[in-house]
Amino acid sequence: MMTVEVFSVIILVLLFLILALTLLFVLLNKRTRSFVIRTFTGLFRSKHTTSQKNFYDNLTSTLLRLSTDKIGAIIAIENQDSLESYVNIGYRVTSDFSPELLVTIFYNKQSPLHDGAVIVRDYQIVSVSSYFPMTRQLIDVSYGSRHRSALGLTEKCDAIVFIVSETTGKISVAVRGVIKTLSSNSDRLQDQIIHYLTVKPG
């Protein structure tokens, strides 16, 4: 009589053979292989696209809220060049990006986190109260220390840095050592954000 152990081994062997034959069929059949690849690629892209969309929405909302209340802020988005050395200067965290959290960080002027920058990597906050080198450029007198820091960082790497002036409430972006004022209209602002975050800095 067949023992339980022998029966279990036979079942495992059969399962392995079925899996191996299925894999072989997929590899040999171009149409099936293409379907499997498209399916898994589509799932990955769907998740990635959803994360992107949520981040764009949250960043737009954050900048508009900070702008409306004239809360000074600087938010650096890591690109291809690592910002790890600046992450280490500040307080390392791991947190989802949310308007409520960002407003809380920058709102309290008595907080040690108020003046530093927030660094974002892969749609998550990885550091708060980080500091960047100041630019040596002669810039408009209306720009403050946050703008100088944003320019200083982007002169050295491909990060995209968003700044809100606590004096005027204006929203700006710094890219490759150049600073530009952004729109205060929600739809237009989001279009600009998507442009700067998806176009490779030149």
UniProtKB/Swiss-Prot annotation:
Signal peptide: none annotated. Its main location: membrane. The keyword Membrane applies. It catalyses: 2 ATP = 3',3'-c-di-AMP + 2 diphosphate. One of its GO terms (biological process) is cAMP biosynthetic process. InterPro entries: C-di-AMP_synthase, CdaA, CdaS, DisA, DNA_integrity_DisA_N_sf, DNA_integrity_scan_DisA_N. GO terms for molecular function: adenylate cyclase activity; ATP binding; diadenylate cyclase activity. It holds the Pfam family DAC. The keyword Transmembrane applies. Its EC number is 2.7.7.85. It is an enzyme of class 2 (transferase). It is found in: Cell membrane. The chain crosses the membrane at residues 6-26. Probably oligomerizes. Belongs to the adenylate cyclase family. DacB/CdaS subfamily. Catalyzes the condensation of 2 ATP molecules into cyclic di-AMP (c-di-AMP), a second messenger used to regulate differing processes in different bacteria. NCBIfam families: c-di-AMP_CdaM, diadenylate cyclase CdaA. This is Diadenylate cyclase.
